[in-house]
Amino acid sequence: MVKIQVTPDLSIGDGQPFALIGGPCVIESEDFCLKMADQIRQICDRLQISYIFKSSFDKANRTSIDSFRGQSLEDGLQTLQRVKEKIGVPVLTDIHESYQAAIVAEVVDVLQIPAFLCRQTDLLLAAAATGRVINVKKGQFLAPWDMQNVVKKLEQGGAQNILLTERGSSFGYNTLVVDFRSLPQMRALGYPVVFDATHSVQMPGGKGNSSGGQREFVPYLARAAVAVGIDALFMEIHENPEQALSDGPNMVYLSQLEAYLQQLLAIRTALAW
């Protein structure tokens, strides 16, 4: 498995420290992102965990037309740039259309391909052409071994730094389940694997005009993933998920984050990952 260089000071993969990709689901405001990024960074610093801040400038796949989507592309990138400069952490955000790739890559360290879009060839090639690290969420509809075709598209587009993320599979209506076999199966493709612990407990469209979630199961799934073996954990975090503007039901409380991460590090240490 290759080692992915996110910044000169942060690598993910073979022999590298455990990494957290985390932050609020959507950019609610610049001040809020700065506060969240700073507090999460402090936790990660105490635990010696590598940290990448995550938030979306646009939630283009919300259940309802009336749901909050985020800031504009320009304002969102300005917020992410401020997080990089003031908090001193690399940043990740997702793109939904090919034209966004080059623009967003001017600011972020990691481009994320949403699960619903993981087979979109033009989007993958546009992301690959930027030279940035690319984190691809495995589609809820996709077998883990079928991610080899996603990887081939990215490689043929010139991408060398790829992360593959498990975020659950559709199980009937409004429900996801996690098949942890997917983690070693995707790692066998030669790239680091990430587990998305919060979207894996999402209940897509489960509240009628928005998605539900079962955040109480996040720590259980995260512990299982670390025991199986992952290189990074993806987790959406909010100081008050009940008031969050997107994905509140599956985001974890900031106040609980450090305890969760301590448990995960203990498992990694016990298994000598």
UniProtKB/Swiss-Prot annotation:
EC number(s) per entry: 2.5.1.55
Domain of life, per lineage: Bacteria
GO MF term list: 3-deoxy-8-phosphooctulonate synthase activity
Entry GO CC: cytoplasm
Pathway annotation from the record: Carbohydrate biosynthesis; 3-deoxy-D-manno-octulosonate biosynthesis; 3-deoxy-D-manno-octulosonate from D-ribulose 5-phosphate: step 2/3; Bacterial outer membrane biogenesis; lipopolysaccharide biosynthesis
Compartments, record wording: Cytoplasm
Pfam families: DAHP_synth_1
Any GO BP: keto-3-deoxy-D-manno-octulosonic acid biosynthetic process
Signal sequence bounds: none
Main location: cytoplasm
Reaction equations catalysed: D-arabinose 5-phosphate + phosphoenolpyruvate + H2O = 3-deoxy-alpha-D-manno-2-octulosonate-8-phosphate + phosphate
Class of enzymatic activity (EC top level): transferase
Membership in a protein family: Belongs to the KdsA family.
Stated name of the protein: 2-dehydro-3-deoxyphosphooctonate aldolase
Phylogenetic classification of the source organism: Bacteria, Bacillati, Cyanobacteriota, Cyanophyceae, Gomontiellales
The gene coding this protein: kdsA
